[in-house]
């Protein structure tokens, strides 16, 4: 799956999209160079969400989570409940996808599910506030 495909898909669904790259494959690229601009943009706008794609999504999420205010969740396959709970309970504001382990159709389904799931608040808000201290 190409990042451009997911960007175009999200635009077609009515989402505002800012693409922080990479725009073409370069084996010499380092993912933090693309993840940090996304993470900083999300951290500075509490209404925004970020979608990052990598082979496994693990390193990308680790990089994003270095930015204060970011709560990046990793998903590369499994029960749909995992993706819903990342929003409902953890208010994940970045979704890091392991594109190597998912089909294009699965990625589209997960993007919709994740973006549509609201944060539950309540006791979960208290826990999230503790993450930033």
Regions found by a protein language model. Name each.
Residues 1-3:
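Short, small-residue-biased leader/transition segments that mark boundaries at the very start
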Residues 11-16, 40-44, 88, 112-124, ...:
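Generic secondary-structure signature for well-ordered alpha-helical cores
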Residues 34-74:
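Helix-adjacent hinge/juxtasegments
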Residues 16-28:
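A short beta-strand-loop structural module common to alpha/beta enzyme folds
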Residues 6, 10-14, 64:
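Hydrophobic alpha-helical packing residues
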Residues 78-126:
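Short, glycine-/small-residue-rich phosphate/pyrophosphate-handling segment
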